[in-house]
């Protein structure tokens, strides 16, 4: 819409009120005046809706001010642009003679200055005619000759102006994109000149109505150019099919083809893509036959050029020996110096590809390359790691320091810069959502909520770290953990028959950390752990007892003090006497009752005497983690305290396996001691006549 054009549509708002005495119209502030003072997006949308419905953009209040006056006073640029688009007059004065231009300030004043620079003739004529060829605004149309134009609705002008304001024409954008549009217009004018010979009519919507501007006919172009009125489907080039390409190959089969390095694009014949373009003859008499039939060899890049730069020399980098070239005689190829690549001779058969001479590093060579800079990169070599695992470290005084160092060793073990791609990340990324969740649950990780593109990458990284921890400790991450009777760590020891050196070293380090953390002031020394075993599996020959038989015979692991282990047997005896239903519901009491019924004595073995309650809880939980809760009669798993809560399942199982191996050693030294129903005391405190609270009274005196 021209900025100074007036809206001629009839407003739908009600007529201004009149005074009963004089009958003269008494203008008052309309809704547009209130909206013009606000710069919010809601106000701009509401004002645009009112203007589209036919509100008067130049309505005045009692002081003669228009909505544009309010927009300029409050420095509301967006509202001023909207009002100018719908035909507001910036030079209309109020009762005091002030115009919107005179009271404007800030960004609104700058906009009005730029707006006032160009004359009305330029704004109405030049820019509309200039950008009509490629503008997307609905205020410009190009029609054919002798074609009727549909009549417009009364509010069509306001709707067209609103659409123009929404999409952003030149005036509303303050002529900021004028240069870009001018450059793009040159191509549009060039296309219109070559594709049009008829007369064009531009229908321009103005405040006076529809104005038709006729463009004079241009001269007809040359005969070689196929002139058309506009772009159509027939102008598009035909896409060649297989038959066309095959026919073109048959025609050009006799001409020699130059075998050069291609760009990777499809070799579609030029004659099919551009049928109207004349093919220029190529001068072949200067080109020899040998040049046309030989392959053009490209110089191989020098992969060692980086090590000759000053930056690499200052960093202490040096080229490491690469893998031997792909040659049948590696010894001779290593002695010979590399020659300049020559042009190979052509042969009728299939040409052999040259050997790959690109230098690369293997995993061992990478470690040798970084051997001198281990301290800079804070990486330990492979031999240092193995020696560190075999030799147990000294016990530290601070538990937090020891555990932090252990975690640092794990992280350095998992994510080092020299980690070779073992295919784990590709395996993980191929997992589906359900498979990924099940793999995470094996390591005690439960995803919260659904997996999207952002959270899946995080859980993939966690799973990769856990799998590499297992791989670095000698286990297979793809092993079926569910099918194993015990934990994979205990199964490994049972299969080998002994504790590996690195396995025992890590377990000793965990034992030292537990001792240092849960001993000292504030901790007691009266707790221990105990094991209750099945005599049918354990047998009576302690000397020939194996670790596998010992582990399979354990059906209960507990922690207690004083006579706590006897409490299970006393409860079972009382239930047997009273014949209660607890023998059927409690698996532990049911097993004890079954063994006593068969006439067996039940062996009990106590370990880790004189420790605190927290340390005994950790040891009990580690043994349960190694044996697995499903193989025991315990109702729940153990409890971890302190820094042991952050242990992973591998560390817990390794420590529990270590404790079981020690328990077997002490059992062989002390022997098997059986508990029967007959040799049990009546209570846990047989030498106390009446415990405090039992019986509800004082202890009776002994008669004289």
From Swiss-Prot:
Residues 425-470 form the LEM domain. SUPFAM superfamilies: Ankyrin repeat, LEM domain. Transmembrane segments: none annotated. Inhibited by EDTA. InterPro entries: ANKLE1, Ankyrin_rpt, Ankyrin_rpt-contain_sf, GIY-YIG_endonuc, LEM/LEM-like_dom_sf, LEM_dom. Residues 525-635 form the GIY-YIG domain. Endonuclease which, in association with baf-1, plays an essential role during embryogenesis in the DNA repair response following DNA damage probably by ensuring proper chromosome segregation. Also required during postembryonic cell divisions after DNA damage caused by ionizing radiation to ensure normal cell proliferation. Resolves chromatin bridges in late mitosis that result from incomplete DNA replication, defective chromosome condensation or unresolved recombination intermediates. This is Ankyrin repeat and LEM domain-containing protein 1 homolog.
């Amino acid at each position: 819409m021209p900025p100074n054009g007036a809206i001629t549509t009839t407003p739908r708002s009600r007529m201004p009120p009149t005074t009963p005495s004089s009958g003269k119209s008494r203008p008052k502030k309309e809704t547009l005046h209130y909206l013009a003072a606000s710069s919010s997006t809601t106000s701009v949308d509401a004002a645009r809706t009112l203007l589209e419905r036919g509100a008067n953009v130049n309505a005045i209040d009692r002081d003669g001010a228009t909505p544009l006056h309010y927009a300029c006073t409050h420095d509301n640029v967006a509202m001023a642009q909207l009002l100018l688009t719908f035909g507001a007059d910036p030079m209309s004065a109020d009762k005091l003679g002030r115009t919107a231009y005179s009271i404007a300030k800030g960004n609104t004043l700058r906009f009005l200055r730029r707006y006032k620079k160009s004359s009305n003739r330029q704004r109405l004529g030049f820019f509309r005619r200039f950008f009509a060829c490629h503008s997307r605004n609905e205020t410009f149309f190009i029609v054919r000759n002798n074609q009727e134009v549909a009549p417009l609705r009364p509010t069509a002008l306001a709707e067209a102006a609103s659409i123009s304001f929404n999409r952003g024409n030149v005036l509303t954008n303050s002529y900021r994109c004028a240069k870009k549009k001018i450059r793009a217009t040159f191509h549009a004018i060039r296309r219109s000149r070559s594709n049009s010979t008829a007369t064009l009519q531009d229908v321009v919507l103005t405040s006076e109505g529809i104005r038709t501007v006729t463009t004079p006919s241009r001269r007809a172009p040359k005969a070689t150019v196929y002139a058309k009125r506009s772009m159509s489907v027939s102008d598009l080039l035909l896409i060649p099919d297989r038959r066309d390409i095959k026919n073109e190959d048959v025609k050009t089969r006799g001409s020699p083809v130059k075998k050069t390095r291609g760009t990777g694009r499809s070799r579609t014949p030029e004659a099919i893509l551009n049928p109207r373009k004349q093919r220029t003859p190529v001068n072949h008499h200067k080109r020899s036959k040998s040049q046309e039939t030989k392959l053009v060899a490209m110089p191989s890049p020098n992969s060692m050029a980086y090590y000759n730069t000053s930056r690499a020399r200052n960093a202490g980098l040096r080229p490491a020996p690469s893998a031997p070239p792909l040659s049948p005689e590696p010894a001779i190829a290593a002695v010979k110096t590399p020659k300049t690549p020559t042009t190979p001779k052509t042969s009728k058969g299939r040409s052999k590809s040259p050997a790959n001479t690109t230098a690369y590093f293997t995993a061992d060579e990478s470690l040798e390359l970084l051997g001198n800079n281990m301290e800079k990169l804070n990486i330990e070599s492979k031999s240092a790691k193995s020696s560190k695992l075999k030799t147990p470290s000294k016990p530290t005084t601070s538990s937090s320091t020891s555990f932090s160092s252990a975690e640092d060793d794990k992280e350095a073990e998992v994510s080092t810069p020299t980690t070779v791609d073992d295919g784990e990340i590709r395996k993980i990324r191929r997992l589906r959502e359900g498979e990924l969740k099940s793999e995470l649950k094996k390591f005690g990780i439960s995803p919260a909520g659904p997996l999207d593109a952002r959270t899946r990458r995080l859980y993939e990284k966690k799973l990769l770290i856990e799998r590499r921890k297992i791989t670095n400790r000698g286990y297979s991450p793809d092993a079926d953990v569910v099918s194993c009777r015990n934990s994979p760590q205990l199964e490994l020891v049972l299969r080998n028959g002994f504790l590996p050196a690195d396995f025992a070293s890590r377990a000793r380090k965990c034992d030292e950390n537990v001792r240092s953390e849960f001993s000292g002031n504030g901790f007691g020394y009266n707790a221990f752990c105990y094991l209750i075993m099945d005599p049918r599996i354990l047998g009576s020959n302690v000397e020939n007892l194996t670790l596998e038989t010992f582990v399979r015979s354990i059906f209960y692991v507990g922690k207690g003090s004083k006579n706590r282990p006897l409490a299970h047997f006393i409860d079972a005896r009382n239930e047997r006497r009273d014949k209660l239903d607890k023998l059927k519901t409690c698996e532990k009491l049911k097993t004890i009752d079954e063994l006593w019924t068969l006439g067996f004595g039940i062996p009990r073995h106590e370990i880790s005497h004189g420790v605190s309650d927290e340390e005994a809880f950790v040891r009990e939980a580690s043994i349960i983690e190694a044996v697995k809760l499903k193989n025991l009669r315990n109702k729940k798993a153990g409890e971890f305290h302190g820094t042991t809560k952050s242990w992973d399942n591998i560390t817990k199982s390794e420590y529990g396996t270590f404790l079981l191996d020690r328990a077997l050693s002490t059992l062989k030294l002390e022997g098997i001691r059986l508990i029967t129903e007959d040799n049990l005391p009546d209570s846990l405190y047989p030498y106390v006549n009446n415990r405090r609270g039992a019986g509800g009274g004082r202890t009776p005196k002994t008669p004289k």
